[in-house]
Swiss-Prot record:
Subunit relationships: Part of the 50S ribosomal subunit.
Record-linked SUPFAM superfamilies: Translation proteins SH3-like domain
Naturally occurring in which organism (per UniProt): Anaeromyxobacter sp. (strain K)
SMART domains cross-referenced by the UniProt entry: KOW (SM00739)
GO biological process: translation
Region of interest (Disordered), residue spans: 84-106
Name of this protein: Large ribosomal subunit protein uL24
Keywords: Ribonucleoprotein, Ribosomal protein, RNA-binding, rRNA-binding
Ranges of biased composition (kind: Basic and acidic residues): 84-97
Function: One of two assembly initiator proteins, it binds directly to the 5'-end of the 23S rRNA, where it nucleates assembly of the 50S subunit. One of the proteins that surrounds the polypeptide exit tunnel on the outside of the subunit.
């Protein structure tokens, strides 16, 4: 299983958001959950003057959390990633996260 990190593109494989994909905003390792952009939005009611970011208060919409076991890392082409390692591509000078996919069935 590929390790999920901030900025990865993931696809939800279980729950009410099943089949949707988005970018990971935050990984909460101790809780075993992730925040995914534009998925599992929750509403929070905030009083006036409680935060400097939103002094007028009101109803705020923010990304909720999803269990890590309910998401799967996908590549740029929306296909699942099976293996991942940190290394250099041929001719590259910098290390990067390299992804491998399952071999096609013949």
């Amino acid at each position: 299983m590929a390790e999920i990190r901030k900025g990865d593109t993931v696809k939800v494989i279980a729950g009410k958001e099943k089949g949707k994909s988005g970018r990971v905003l935050e990984v909460l390792r101790e809780d075993g959950r992730v925040r995914v952009e534009k998925l599992m939005t929750v509403k929070r009611h905030q009083k006036k003057g409680r935060s400097q970011a939103n002094p007028e208060g009101g109803i705020l919409e923010m990304a909720g959390t999803i269990a890590i076991s309910s998401v799967m890392v996908v590549g740029k082409d929306e296909k699942p990633v099976r293996r991942e390692k940190i290394g250099r591509e041929l001719g590259a000078k910098e290390k990067a996260r390299l992804q491998k996919r399952k071999a096609a069935a013949k």
